[in-house]
């Protein structure tokens, strides 16, 4: 499938920071999803794991997935930005590479679909301000 990428979404998984990609795949299967919620996840050591090729549609943000790529750091169960330095560093490299490949794509945190007012957010994912960070 040839997709036009309009958005790059940054997420946290909202779970235990020590989880591994296989744990996430089990969670997605339990939800009845045929595909993962993210294209890439970053574990606590800063290792990036490809969960789904970019050519395929992930289940990251309902209603926004067709033209989006989803990147997540594993963790965030406390609702805070508890990324390790390794996760933050890897995220910066991935975002830089994706922005080079898809220069027209808008970079957003999951929560940004509800605007800038925290009172309107249905979740705090990715638990930090993507616009300020990147």
Model-derived features: positions:
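Short, conserved "active-site rim" segments that organize catalytic pockets and cofactor/ligand binding
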Residues: 1-56, 126
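Ligand-binding face of N-terminal immunoglobulin V-set domains in extracellular IgSF glycoproteins
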Residues: 71
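Short glycine-rich loop/turn motifs that provide flexible caps or phosphate-binding loops at active sites
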Residues: 36, 62, 74-75, 108
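A short, structured beta-strand/loop element
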Residues: 56-59, 63-66
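Basic/polar, cationic surfaces and motifs that engage anionic cell-wall
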Residues: 1-9, 13, 45-48, 67, ...
